[in-house]
Amino acid sequence: MDNDKYLKGTTTVGVVCTDGIVLASEQRATMGHFIASKTAKKVYQIDDLVGMTTAGSVGDAQQLVRLVSVESQLYKMRRDESMTIKGITTLMSNFLSRNRYYPMMVQLLIGGVDKNGPGIYSLDAMGGSIEETRISATGSGSPMAYGVLEDQYRENMTVKEGLDLAIRAIHNATKRDSASGENIDVVVITKEAFKRLDPEEVKSRRALLN
């Protein structure tokens, strides 16, 4: 089966910092060569201090967000503590693996801060997961994003530095990937809070890159 018509373009990135993590995406949604939306949401909050980025089929991604959010809340109610990032990733991995013969066309980043510190995991449509110790990118614009991330990431970055790096990586990807574009959505997660940056602040930071 030719899956090309089911695949949707996107660029999302994740950056691991000393005091938290940064998740970011652009906001263009496409159907083939048609721009279906310029305000698509691709970074979701799935627990108090855990977020997820989605690339691929919008419907599949939204179903997975609902699933993992509910399971995370049920776990918290039963055990009076939050699931770890690895635990949430394992839950998602098992669900994707069970559906391998009817795969959900998604590529995900799950990241946040738990009792073990900041962390990010990447998952593919078959449920394969990799712990990312520094940087990660998904979607059709990821090759361009990785060029920036690999070149400018350094050890011991703070989230303030990491968010500028994430914005730069997405910004550069939108220049060459026609399926990525429009505004940039940025989330910063520290041990204190899950914070989605104001769009005007992101625009101001992005303007400095031109």
Swiss-Prot record:
Ways its activity is controlled: The formation of the proteasomal ATPase PAN-20S proteasome complex, via the docking of the C-termini of PAN into the intersubunit pockets in the alpha-rings, triggers opening of the gate for substrate entry. Interconversion between the open-gate and close-gate conformations leads to a dynamic regulation of the 20S proteasome proteolysis activity.
Keywords: Autocatalytic cleavage, Cytoplasm, Hydrolase, Protease, Proteasome, Threonine protease, Zymogen
Active site: 10 (nucleophile)
Pfam families: Proteasome
PROSITE patterns: PROTEASOME_BETA_1 (PS00854), PROTEASOME_BETA_2 (PS51476)
Propeptide position ranges: 1-9
Catalysed reaction, written as an equation: Cleavage of peptide bonds with very broad specificity
GO molecular function, one term: threonine-type endopeptidase activity
Transmembrane spans: none
Sequence similarity: Belongs to the peptidase T1B family.
Source species, domain of life: Archaea
Compartments, record wording: Cytoplasm
EC number: 3.4.25.1
One Gene Ontology cellular component annotation held by this UniProt entry: cytoplasm
Protein name in UniProt: Proteasome subunit beta
Function summary: Component of the proteasome core, a large protease complex with broad specificity involved in protein degradation.
Matching InterPro entries: Ntn_hydrolases_N, Pept_T1A_Psome_bsu_arc, Pept_T1A_subB, Proteasome_bsu_CS, Proteasome_sua/b, Proteasome_suB-type
Gene: psmB
GO term, biological process aspect, one: proteasomal protein catabolic process
